[in-house]
Swiss-Prot record:
CDD domains: CysRS_core. It is an enzyme of class 6 (ligase). One of its GO terms (biological process) is cysteinyl-tRNA aminoacylation. Its cofactor is Zn(2+). GO terms for cellular component: cytosol. It comes from Chlorobium luteolum (strain DSM 273 / BCRC 81028 / 2530) (Pelodictyon luteolum). ATP binds at K281. The gene is cysS. Pfam families: DALR_2, tRNA-synt_1e. The lineage of its organism: Bacteria, Pseudomonadati, Chlorobiota, Chlorobiia, Chlorobiales. This is Cysteine--tRNA ligase. A motif ('KMSKS' region) lies at residues 278-282.
Length: 483
């Protein structure tokens, strides 16, 4: 089936047709780097990572841009309050750029561990001040913006389409409660800041035609997306909490400046809850990824996220993550068994499972249904491999190709060079086998001598290192529990 995407702008699934055949430009709002990444970040960036992976697997040439907000995001997410990075720098008694660079590195490290592919371009807001000033100047000259006391505001009344994404069309009702700051100097309470005058001592400020200041949060994404992807973007993604005001303001300022549609397909991922309660830093229940990774395989966290559709809420609990960890381990064991299998004479048609997987992904990137198809294939594969005649060479090849495409290339829940991969690291894998052979023999001798303390010690230390031992009537076996 052709790819369909739920477009938040039209509030319906729509056939995907990029602006230029065979080429897709996608922009996703990146993090504001003033703290470590949490599970909400993981939900968003894993979801859009799979979108990019599937588009590439489908034959599109994808240019993926994801910004880093290192200035201009105020503490109330609108026009008031202190810059979040400047505030963190003040709290930590250091420079804002040091804060931004430290937490950018932290964010990228977490994304790498989750298997999130790096975007083609990761522009910094501070590296695009001239582009942002030029966009503000263009809006002022076109009559869509005005300056008051060194602040420049976008005039919402000048853009009739304001509210078309969020459905908020009653401008009188769009007050500060909707997170667009109200200032008496604005012509309309709904007007939003494009450029903010820097207060005395402000740590990050630049010269502009309106005096020393810094860009508004909404402005950054418009300027950077248009620079790298053009005036019209195929896909713009982000969390549903950004739909208003952030994305609504992006549309207004971009379309007012260029008189062209800004985005063809708007995609919004849903939010994360913790044990049924909304997650947030203000509620002090934000789940820090680095804390999760101390006890949970990062790829199991990724698998947990993908078991829920990107537009569905994700409820985090220890029980749910444990279930995902166990499920991923079953798939890894099946794949390892598939790698080690030698050709027999039996048959297994992988095509129906491959079709189910592709149809699920073409249906608005439905990863839960795609994963269900992979589990069904895993079950059928194990049944076939249990038979005395096994599987013939062509069936094994087709099965390996399906597992590689689904689990590695598209879902990203396994890697090529780790356990469960099509390649196992060459000499490093041989070395591991040799070491494990010695340890398994030592443990076997300990059990024969009823030295269960030593036997259990070996087992427990290996488990802590990511290797699980299973004792059965046929003997002991081992497998990796993480990459």
């Amino acid at each position: 089936m052709p790819l369909v995407i739920f477009n938040s702008l039209g509030r319906e699934k729509q056939l995907f047709e990029p602006l230029h055949p065979g080429v897709v430009g996608i922009y996703v709002c990146g993090p504001t780097v003033y703290g470590h990444a949490h599970l909400g970040h993981a939900k968003s960036y894993v979801s859009f990572d799979v979108v990019v992976r599937w588009l590439r697997e489908s034959g599109y040439r994808v240019k993926y841009v994801q910004n880093i907000t290192d200035v201009g995001h105020l503490s109330d997410d609108a026009d008031e309050g202190e810059d979040k990075i400047a505030r963190q720098a003040r709290l930590e008694k250091t420079d804002p750029m040091e804060i931004a660079q430290f937490y950018t590195r932290s964010f990228l490290d977490d994304m790498d561990r989750l298997g999130v592919l790096r975007p083609n371009i990761s522009p910094l807001a501070t590296g695009h001040i001239p582009e942002q000033i030029a966009l503000v100047d263009k809006l002022v000259k076109r009559g869509h913006a005005y300056e008051v006391n060194g602040n420049v505001y976008f005039s919402v009344e000048s853009f009739p389409g304001y509210g078309k994404l969020s459905g908020r069309t009653d401008l009188d009702a769009v007050q500060s409660g909707a997170r667009v700051g109200v200032r008496s100097e604005k012509h309309n309470p709904s007007d939003f800041a494009l450029w903010k005058k820097a207060e005395e001592g402000h740590l990050m400020q630049w010269d502009s035609p309106w005096g020393m200041g810094y860009p508004g949060w909404h402005l950054e994404c418009s300027a950077m997306s248009m620079k790298y992807l053009g005036d019209t973007i195929d896909i713009h993604g982000g969390g549903m909490e950004n739909r208003f005001p952030h994305h609504e303001c992006e549309i207004a300022q971009s379309e007012a400046a260029n008189e062209k549609p800004y985005v063809r397909y708007w995609m919004h991922n849903n939010m994360v809850t913790v044990n049924g309660t909304k997650m947030g830093k203000s509620l002090k229940n934000a789940v820090n990824l680095k804390e999760i990774f101390k006890t949970v395989d990062p790829l199991a966290v990724r698998f947990f996220i993908l078991q829920s559709h990107y537009r569905s809420p994700l409820d985090y609990s220890d029980t749910a993550v444990a279930g995902s960890t166990a499920g991923l381990q079953k798939l890894r064991e099946t794949r390892q068994r598939l790698i080690e299998a030698t050709p027999g004479t039996g048959l297994l048609d992988a095509a129906p499972f491959s079709l189910r997987f592709r149809e699920a992904m073409d249906d608005d990137f439905n990863t839960p249904v795609a994963i269900a198809a992979l589990f069904d294939f895993s079950k059928a594969l194990n049944t076939a491999l249990d038979r005395p005649d096994g599987l013939n060479a062509s069936s094994l090849e087709a099965a390996r190709e399906l597992f590689s495409t689904a689990a590695v290339t598209v879902l990203g829940i396994m890697t090529e060079d780790a356990e469960g991969g099509m390649h196992d690291g060459g000499r490093s894998a041989e070395t591991l086998d040799e070491v494990m052979g010695v340890l398994m023999e030592l443990r076997s001798e300990a059990r024969k001598n009823k030295d269960f303390a030593t036997s259990d010690l070996i087992r427990d230390h290996l488990l802590a290192a990511g290797i699980e031992i299973k004792d059965t009537r046929e003997g002991a076996s081992w497998s990796k529990t993480r990459h």
